[in-house]
From Swiss-Prot:
GO terms for cellular component: cytosol; plasma membrane. Residues 124-127 are annotated as: G4. Residues 7-176 form the Era-type G domain. This is GTPase Era. It comes from Rickettsia canadensis (strain McKiel). It is a peripheral membrane protein. InterPro entries: G_ERA_dom, GTP-bd, GTPase_Era-like, KH_dom-like_a/b, KH_dom_type_2, KH_sf_prok-type, P-loop_NTPase, Small_GTP-bd. GTP binds at residues 15-22, 62-66, 124-127.
Length: 295
């Protein structure tokens, strides 16, 4: 019996916050793995997505958005994004086609050039008519002639098949790093924490979602095939805790119910979710939390 030839290719997806990196990863692997919200800087760490197509395994790295960081957490997120480039065969810079170029995007291009990296450009959100699209195409084509350019819609899936054909064409003969049906290498505890953090982003106003983190402290598989999960939402101030709890605990109950539903859908089993809020001043300066967040 002839042994199957295996190929692998790794792809790093970088770009500004809210340019569509997480939506693209989810679209390609066919699962909602990376959390998505309308707020910027939702992704804090590298999210690895895996899809195996015939003889080729594609490993995708969704990264935190690149911007001008100020605080300790923001700086760690941007460092995390840049660190992912060195482990990838392809670097894809995703650009929001609904916005003009700005200094941050130019700085990203300059840094890629200084690193001798020739990125693939992905002009995203073409499902919406944009007055900037043609100018973006012209600028990139003229100033970066060695780079390929794909207009895509991560949301609708337009041109994603073409993009995948290109990605798989760059695969090299090498043993797969993961099982054929794996979609990520992230621990289930981490994924569960990300699901709850997504609901905190969606259900809390203003800056509060940026001032917290979530840790899964307990994951217990029960005899009836359900899972008991205890999570701690860590905040820096007592006033933040009050907001998250809500009147008579109404807000945290709402967040818990929505998180549990998302977990049951992702993990395909009944979930018993228990949320707790703890105040830890200056948690953003504690390396322990960064290790848990993988940044």
């Amino acid at each position: 019996m002839t042994k199957q030839i295996q190929k692998t290719v790794s792809v790093c997806i970088i770009g500004r916050p809210n340019s569509g990196k997480s939506t693209l990863l989810n679209r390609i692997i066919g699962e909602k793995l990376s959390i998505v919200t309308p707020k910027v800087q939702t992704t804090r760490s590298i999210i690895t997505g895996i899809i195996t197509l015939k003889d080729t395994q594609v490993i995708l790295y969704d990264t935190p958005g690149i911007f001008e960081p100020k605080g300790t957490l923001e700086k760690a997120m941007v460092r995390c994004a840049w660190s992912s480039l060195h482990s990838a065969d392809l670097v894809m810079l995703i650009i929001d086609s609904l916005k003009p170029f700005d200094d941050v995007t130019h700085n990203i291009l300059d840094k890629l050039c200084s690193l001798n990296i020739v990125p693939v450009f992905l002009l995203n959100k073409i499902e919406i008519e944009s007055k900037y699209l043609n100018n973006l195409k012209a600028f990139l084509t003229e100033n970066h002639p060695d780079s390929l350019l794909f207009p895509i819609s991560a949301l609708s899936g337009k041109n994603i098949d073409r993009l995948l054909e290109y990605i798989t064409s760059k695969a090299k003969i090498a043993p797969w790093l993961y099982a054929e049906d794996d979609i990520t290498d992230l621990p289930m505890r981490f994924i569960a924490a990300e699901i709850t953090r997504e609901q905190l982003f969606l259900n809390l106003q203003q800056e509060l979602p940026y001032k917290l983190t979530v840790q899964t402290e307990k994951w217990e598989e029960l005899k009836d095939k359900s899972v008991k999960i205890n999570q701690v939402i860590v905040v820096a101030r007592e006033s933040y805790k009050t907001i998250i709890l809500g009147k008579n605990g109404s807000k945290i109950k709402e967040i818990g119910a929505k998180s549990r539903m998302q977990m049951e859908q992702f993990f395909s089993c009944p979930i018993h979710l228990f949320l707790f809020v703890k105040v830890r001043e200056l948690w953003e300066n504690n390396q322990e939390f960064y290790q848990y967040m993988k940044i």
